[in-house]
Every structure is written in structure tokens, then in C-alpha cells.
Amino acid sequence: MRTASITRNTSETAIAVELNLDGTGAYSVATGIGFLDHMLEQLSRHSLIDLTVKIDGDLHIDQHHTTEDSGIAIGEALAKALGDKKGITRYGHAYAPMDETLTRVALDISGRPWTVWKVDLKGPRLGEWDTELIEHWFQSFAQAAGITLHVENLYGTNQHHIVESCYKGLARALRTAVEIDPRKADSIPSTKGML
């Protein structure tokens, strides 16, 4: 099974993540930030990646460390579960509509982390979550996972819908990219022979 467990303890956060790439989208998420929990639940459900996340963070200071470290830990778990990446589809993309909103996400499990974020969030918060941290979550996740990630909100007005479409787009793109290609199940999807 392609699974991973990550424990990450710093002076700012204590995190435990369990991930199963070949799951059913089952989740148990407790970050202490309600809207982040909601987004990670969407990520799990729509990627079919089972995800357990438990964080005890320094929320009495602010949400930055919890947001950043959750992205790092989930990204590390994804990279660990992928192992040598043998047989994966590697690329994934998705258009994620949500009411008036449409977001496009494309990714490459390349081993070359990069994030392009073209999402304009107008308000300072979603629930209690600082919206400036949302881009940072995606950057932290992509860096730790070793993926090239492009997220572009094409249009939309409701911030909740915009952010949720970003996470659902990521989920659907990941679902495709981590799948085993039955025609190439024993090979690395790169002419270099490694990712």
C-alpha cells in the first residue's frame, strides 16, 4: 500500500499526519482552524486520498505556523507515500466549478517544486482564517511534496467558493496524477529514469 505517516514537532506546532493514496477519501482533520479543516476534508474526499491530520499549534499567536506546517507535513506525507513514483500518471489537471466560480489547477509530480498562484482574494478572512495564508499553504504543500503546481482562479466573486474550488481542483488533479498507469506500472514516468 502507498501510505505514509509523518510526525512533525517544533516549538510552534505538533503535527501528526497519516495518508493513504489508494484510499476512499476518508478523513479525520483537526487543525484548530475551522475553514482549513473544511478545505482539507475537501482535499481528501475529492482526491480519494485518506487523510488524518491532528495539529496542536500556537494559535494563541496567530494561524501562520499551523497553516504552513500543515502544508509541509501533508506534502511530506504525499512524497513519502509516492516512494520512487514508479507507475504514477505524474500529471494531473482539473477545472473546478463552484456556483459562480471556476478555478483551473494543473500539477506535475516532478521532484521540482514550484508554485504559480493566480488567485485574488479581496477580504482579510474566511471564517477566522487569514486569507493571506491560503497561498502560503499551497506553496508549503508543493515545496514539501516536490510538485510543480499551478492554481488559477478564472473568475468568481465569493471568497468561500474561490478557495474551495482551489482545494477541490487540487484534489481532482492529485487524484489523476497519483493513479498508477496500468500500461507503465513498472516504470518511472520520466526519460531520465527518476523523478
Curated annotation (Swiss-Prot):
Keyword Isomerase: no
Enzyme Commission number, as recorded: 4.2.1.19
One GO location term (cellular component): cytoplasm
UniProt KW keywords: Amino-acid biosynthesis, Cytoplasm, Histidine biosynthesis, Lyase
Pfam families in the cross-refs: IGPD
Catalytic reaction(s) noted: D-erythro-1-(imidazol-4-yl)glycerol 3-phosphate = 3-(imidazol-4-yl)-2-oxopropyl phosphate + H2O
SUPFAM superfamilies documented for this protein: Ribosomal protein S5 domain 2-like
Subcellular localization(s) per the UniProt record: Cytoplasm
Principal subcellular localization: cytoplasm
GO molecular function: imidazoleglycerol-phosphate dehydratase activity
Pathway of action: Amino-acid biosynthesis; L-histidine biosynthesis; L-histidine from 5-phospho-alpha-D-ribose 1-diphosphate: step 6/9
InterPro entries: IGPD_sf, ImidazoleglycerolP_deHydtase, ImidazoleglycerP_deHydtase_CS, Ribosomal_Su5_D2-typ_SF
Record carries keyword Manganese: no
GO biological process, one term: L-histidine biosynthetic process
NCBIfam families listed in its UniProt record: PRK00951.1-5 (NF002109), PRK00951.2-1 (NF002111), PRK00951.2-4 (NF002114)
HAMAP family per record: HisB
Similarity comment: family membership: Belongs to the imidazoleglycerol-phosphate dehydratase family.
Name of the protein this chain belongs to: Imidazoleglycerol-phosphate dehydratase
Gene designation: hisB
